[in-house]
């Protein structure tokens, strides 16, 4: 993210010229400042959930079920958002199913594509050759499957698990989109199935926000004549109970942010406490990660204000002072800063102290150092962009991306997210892995950086902004804006391929860690799908309300 400040104080007297971004204000007022958890309702949900979990666990491990039926059960559990209760059992089942899988089984397209997606989601490298039997001698899809809406939908979702070099899945992706759009426009689909297809075309399973997609699927599954009432009941109860937890956490975060009162001292910045918590909930929604969600949200809030300071307020000389202060990470450095920066710097140091104290209670404070170092690195890269803007410099695309992969926050968000995980998962080796600049973290950062560059380009250039990836690519290659956008989206797709490949076994680190990097990539797809939904929070307003306020009717 970049710098839009111009001018500096003359002899320390005149107020410098500042190109303010005039960001939209917070949407929420005092909406989330008070919430009282209904303990009786919580206990009621919890007691029934425990009973249902044991019933479902028995279903998962029960023998005698055909492989296709077992894969379908696992798929339903995952899409209903309750599979996290049965991770061990599901992994054991999938290991057996993958070892025994025979692609000469008389499976239809829906079933083959479902196997492919589920196996790949769990790290098993199933070959896309399994789809060859659905193509004719011209390598085109047979007419018998082209009009199979469930088969097309299943294959469409499976194509999002592609890796580099799988041209067939690229072709299948384009083909299934065209077929599904045609089928939706026709007269033969039921309204329920049509709604399901339209939602899938807008948001794929693999790139979606897990809890939001679970809520959507619950509404579809409820209308399915073959639904299992036990699974449906568990999903509804689990969503509503977890929503109560998240709402209580959001209330604590929101009150903390109001009491911190930082925005009154830096009114140029985006006020996004709710949106940062929304982001953190995508990274990890499970109940045991409440401390992690709080810490990640607080760090994201301070980074957001820091970004806006470099991007839309601070002068170059002020920013150099702030960069130096952050590198020192010492309260005495505050003396050299302008008043508004003192408030931000004090908040930064205090937030990290708070997070470190909270994690120390659980013996997990060792990751805080890595998060601090990542924060320092981002600030150094923000200053580079500020200098580029001051000089009117347009970097080569390669030079831009080298710096942008830092400002994309991939390392900081991943490190800060890992801090909130269990000590036996987020080990010291996990933090050292991040320092190696792994392909998956770089890919996640590239997705966030490039999609943001595309979606925020016009608005940022209007107010004055360092050249973004879009500008750098246009200048270097002599192409139009639209041509550059096409190329940037190709890069985004390749980044997704890299993420998918890094999650195939054997993995560099635990899948429990890699899924967090995937989730941080997913939020970029959701928030920046059509516009910059972080800067313009009304775009994701419905998502926030659905996730934190509206329970599922029982």
UniProtKB/Swiss-Prot annotation:
Pfam families: Terpene_synth, Terpene_synth_C. GO terms for molecular function: carbon-oxygen lyase activity, acting on phosphates; magnesium ion binding; terpene synthase activity. SUPFAM superfamilies: Terpenoid cyclases/Protein prenyltransferases (SSF48239), Terpenoid synthases (SSF48576). Binds 3 Mg(2+) ions per subunit. It is an enzyme of class 4 (lyase). Terpene synthase that catalyzes the biosynthesis of the terpene valerianol, which is a volatile compound of floral scent. InterPro entries: Isoprenoid_synthase_dom_sf (IPR008949), Terpene_cyclase-like_1_C (IPR034741), Terpene_cyclase_plant_C1 (IPR044814), Terpene_synth_N (IPR001906), Terpene_synth_N_sf (IPR036965), Terpene_synthase-like (IPR050148), Terpene_synthase_metal-bd (IPR005630), Terpenoid_cyclase/PrenylTrfase (IPR008930). The Asp-Asp-Xaa-Xaa-Asp/Glu (DDXXD/E) motif is important for the catalytic activity, presumably through binding to Mg(2+). Belongs to the terpene synthase family. Mg(2+) 2 binds at residues 307, 311. Keywords: Lyase, Magnesium, Metal-binding. The lineage of its organism: Eukaryota, Viridiplantae, Streptophyta, Embryophyta, Tracheophyta. A motif (DDXXD motif) lies at residues 326-330. Pathway: Secondary metabolite biosynthesis; terpenoid biosynthesis. This is Valerianol synthase TPS1F. Mg(2+) 1 binds at residues 307, 311. It comes from Camellia hiemalis. Its EC number is 4.2.3.204. The keyword Iron-sulfur does not apply. One of its GO terms (biological process) is sesquiterpenoid biosynthetic process. It catalyses: (2E,6E)-farnesyl diphosphate + H2O = valerianol + diphosphate.
């Amino acid at each position: 993210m970049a710098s839009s400040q111009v001018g500096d104080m003359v002899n320390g007297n005149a107020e410098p010229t500042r190109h303010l971004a005039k960001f939209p204000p917070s949407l929420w007022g005092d909406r989330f400042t008070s919430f009282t958890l209904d303990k009786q309702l919580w206990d009621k949900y919890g007691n029934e959930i425990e009973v249902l979990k044991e019933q479902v666990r028995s279903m998962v491990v029960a023998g005698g079920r055909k492989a296709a039926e077992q894969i379908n059960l696992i798929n339903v559990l995952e899409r209903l958002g309750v599979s996290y209760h049965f991770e061990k059992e599901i992994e054991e089942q999938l290991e057996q199913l993958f070892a025994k899988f025979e692609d000469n089984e008389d499976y239809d397209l829906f079933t083959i594509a479902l196997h492919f997606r589920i196996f790949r989601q769990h790290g098993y490298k199933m070959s896309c050759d399994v789809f060859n039997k659905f193509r004719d001698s011209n390598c085109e899809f047979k007419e018998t499957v082209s009009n199979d809406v469930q088969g097309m939908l299943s294959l469409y979702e499976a194509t999002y698990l592609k890796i580099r070099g799988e041209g067939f899945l690229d072709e299948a992706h384009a083909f299934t989109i065209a077929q599904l759009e045609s089928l939706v426009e026709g007269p033969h689909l039921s309204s329920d199935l049509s709604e399901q297809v339209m939602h899938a075309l807008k948001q794929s399973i693999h790139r979606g926000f897990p809890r939001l997609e679970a809520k959507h699927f619950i509404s579809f599954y409820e209308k399915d004549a073959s639904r299992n009432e036990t699974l449906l009941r568990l999903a509804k109860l689990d969503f509503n109970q977890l929503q109560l937890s998240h709402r209580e956490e959001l209330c604590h975060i929101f009150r903390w942010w109001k009491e911190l009162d930082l925005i009154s001292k830096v009114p140029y910045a985006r006020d996004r406490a709710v949106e940062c918590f929304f982001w953190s909930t995508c990274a990890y929604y499970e109940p045991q990660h409440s401390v992690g969600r709080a810490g990640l949200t607080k760090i994201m809030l301070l980074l957001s204000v820091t970004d806006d300071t470099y991007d839309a307020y601070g002068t170059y000389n002020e920013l150099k002072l702030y960069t130096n202060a952050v590198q020192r990470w010492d309260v005495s450095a505050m003396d050299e800063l302008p008043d508004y920066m003192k408030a931000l710097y004090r908040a930064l140091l205090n937030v990290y102290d708070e997070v470190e104290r909270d994690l120390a209670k659980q013996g997990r404070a060792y990751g805080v150092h890595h998060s601090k170092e990542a924060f320092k690195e981002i600030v150094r890269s923000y200053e580079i962009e500020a200098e580029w803007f001051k000089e009117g410099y347009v970097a080569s695309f390669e030079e831009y991306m080298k710096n942008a992969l830092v400002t994309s926050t991939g390392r900081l968000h991943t490190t800060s997210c890992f801090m909130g995980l269990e000590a036996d998962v987020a080990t010291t080796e996990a933090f050292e892995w991040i320092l190696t600049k792994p392909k998956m973290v770089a890919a996640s950062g590239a997705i966030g950086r490039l999609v943001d560059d595309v979606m925020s380009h016009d608005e940022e250039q209007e107010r004055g902004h360092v050249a973004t990836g879009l500008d750098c690519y246009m200048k270097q290659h002599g192409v139009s804006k639209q041509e550059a956008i096409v190329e940037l989206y190709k890069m985004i797709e390749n980044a997704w391929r890299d993420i998918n490949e890094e999650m195939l076994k054997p993995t560099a680190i635990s899948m429990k860690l890699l899924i967090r990097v995937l989730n941080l990539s997913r939020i970029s797809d959701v928030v920046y799908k059509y516009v910059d939904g972080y800067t313009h929070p009304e775009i994701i307003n419905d998502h926030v309300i659905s996730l934190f306020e509206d329970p599922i009717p029982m």
